[in-house]
């Protein structure tokens, strides 16, 4: 079976590398345009393009998919297209040229849209999964080919969940391709939910919320891009939220550093309904360190308050 692979970021590159390692016949790759990346903002190839070039697979970055993409299909004659985080909606007539299947990081119809991994964590889901579906014109609305669910740990951060999506997603993709064609099942559109794009405003944590909600917010963006708040008007990032203690002391302002633990190094922060243990804090231009290290360095102490600027 001749495969056209479409994808752009590091996540998609892991899938392309997997397919090649498993000896699937990837005949061509389509990725988005190269963009400036890194501190120097140097124009660099997309991670998917780098993998394709590494293995000598023809890679294309068309501006107009309905023109150039159709030409690629005509020249390379793929039997199927596999799409992983390509980053653009696919439209007719390209959609009709070959069967196109997308690997989506949620159990559709839940969490349609661009940020399903983070939104599931943020909402406190304990089960999520991977869906392979046939692409249609509606966003993530196509018929389902295969799904695989897996559990999330209570304190599991995005970085760990991301790795699970690569492991279980690539395994599911292999199963799909080995058994293709498979029976398709229409989605129940009445049960659809949406996972909107992550905006900068989403990255600020509010300690006047319940402790579980604050923990899930920190988990969803740990280790990247990291949630933000302000300490003495300095923007800091927080990582490693886990243990929650009950606390009914209403006289303590939410966001207050109640204590810093010597054994674990955690900061214990007041929320509206409890105390949340947070392992790491990161100051501008510095690496993340434990709250205890920050205290020993004179950067933070008990009684200080995390606040968001209005």
Swiss-Prot record:
Transmembrane segments: none annotated. Its EC number is 2.1.2.9. CDD domains: FMT_core_Met-tRNA-FMT_N, Met_tRNA_FMT_C. The keyword Protein biosynthesis applies. One of its GO terms (cellular component) is cytosol. It comes from the Bacteria. Signal peptide: none annotated. Attaches a formyl group to the free amino group of methionyl-tRNA(fMet). The formyl group appears to play a dual role in the initiator identity of N-formylmethionyl-tRNA by promoting its recognition by IF2 and preventing the misappropriation of this tRNA by the elongation apparatus. Belongs to the Fmt family. This is Methionyl-tRNA formyltransferase. It comes from Fervidobacterium nodosum (strain ATCC 35602 / DSM 5306 / Rt17-B1). The gene is fmt.
């Amino acid at each position: 079976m001749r495969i056209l692979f479409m994808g752009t970021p590091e996540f998609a590159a892991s899938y392309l590398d997997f397919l090649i390692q498993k000896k699937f016949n990837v005949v061509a790759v389509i990725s988005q345009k190269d963009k400036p990346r890194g501190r120097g903002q140097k124009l660099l190839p997309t991670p998917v393009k780098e993998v394709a070039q590494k293995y000598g697979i023809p890679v294309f970055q068309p501006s107009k998919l309905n023109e150039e993409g159709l030409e690629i299909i005509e020249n390379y004659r793929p039997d199927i297209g596999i799409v992983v985080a390509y980053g653009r909606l696919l439209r007719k007539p390209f959609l009709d040229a070959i069967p196109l299947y997308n690997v989506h990081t949620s159990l559709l119809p839940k969490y349609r849209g661009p940020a399903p991994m983070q939104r599931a964590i943020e909402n406190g889901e304990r089960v999520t999964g991977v869906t392979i579906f046939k692409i249609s014109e509606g966003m993530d609305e196509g018929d389902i080919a295969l799904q695989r669910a897996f559990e999330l740990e209570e304190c599991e951060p995005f970085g760990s969940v991301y790795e699970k999506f690569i492991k279980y997603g690539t395994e599911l993709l292999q199963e799909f391709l080995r058994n293709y064609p498979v029976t398709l099942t229409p989605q129940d559109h009445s049960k659809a939910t949406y996972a909107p794009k992550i905006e900068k405003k989403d990255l600020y944590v509010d300690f006047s919320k319940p402790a579980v909600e604050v923990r899930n917010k920190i988990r969803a963006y740990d280790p990247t891009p990291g949630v933000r708040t302000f300490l003495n008007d300095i923007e800091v990032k927080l990582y490693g939220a886990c243990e929650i203690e009950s606390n009914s002391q209403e006289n303590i302002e939410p966001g207050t550093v109640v204590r810093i633990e010597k054994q674990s190094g955690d900061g214990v922060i007041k929320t509206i309904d409890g105390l949340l243990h947070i392992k790491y804090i990161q100051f501008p231009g510095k690496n993340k360190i434990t709250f205890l290290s920050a205290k020993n360095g004179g950067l933070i102490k008990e009684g200080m308050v995390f606040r968001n600027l209005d």
